[in-house]
Amino acid sequence: PMGPSRRLGALGLPFPSTDVRVVDPEDPDPEREVPDGEPGELLVRGPQVFAGYWEDEAATQAAILPGGWLRTGDIVRREDSFLWMADRKRELILTGGFNVYPSQVEAAIRSMRGVADVAVVGLPDGAMGELVCAAGVLTEGTVPGSVTLEAVREHAERMVPRYALPHRLEVIEEMPRSQIGKILRRVVREQVLARAAEEG
């Protein structure tokens, strides 16, 4: 039942005996949390957290911080003590020294007329790190060519910072999804890279 201890769409509240921190993913110090509402990596500590990987000290040190904090790889926001999923750390796009969270850009573009679905991925871009690319499925009846990169950027600029705006737009027929309905950004990225290679 809904109540003060539940929020629709939230990950929820930590279990008893479980400590959580939301920290900078590039400098995951449990003593320095990001401000509420800001995205950060979720750290978890408690009796249910495993002690490490069997005979793999390097993987253990990468996953478990001093003090028993587990790096989950989940990018979350905390608001009123509730946690909200933002992205996975491995899907973060690094462009020009800025972190771009694909789900934030996707939400902005998805609200655009003519766009049924969208995935945002990073493509290799030399000195800039990665280029932000949007791959979108158009709504039925949308005229091909009516949803342009310029129109997408203009629409999304009201909701996301300029550095997060896409620099490439691909229109695709169908969005690749997992069996549970999650967008397969890795597959989208491979499709876009294959198209770019064909174009030369």
Residue map of PLM features:
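Sparse recognition of residues in long alpha-helices and their boundaries
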Residues: 35, 168, 172, 196-197
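Acidic/polar alpha-helix N-cap and adjacent early helical turns
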Residues: 190-200
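Conserved AMP-binding/adenylate-forming
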Residues: 1-83, 89-92, 105-106, 115, ...
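AMP-binding/adenylate-forming catalytic core of the ANL superfamily
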Residues: 46, 51-52, 67, 73-164, ...
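Beta-strand->loop->alpha-helix junctions that form or flank phosphate-binding loops
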Residues: 12-14, 121-124, 170
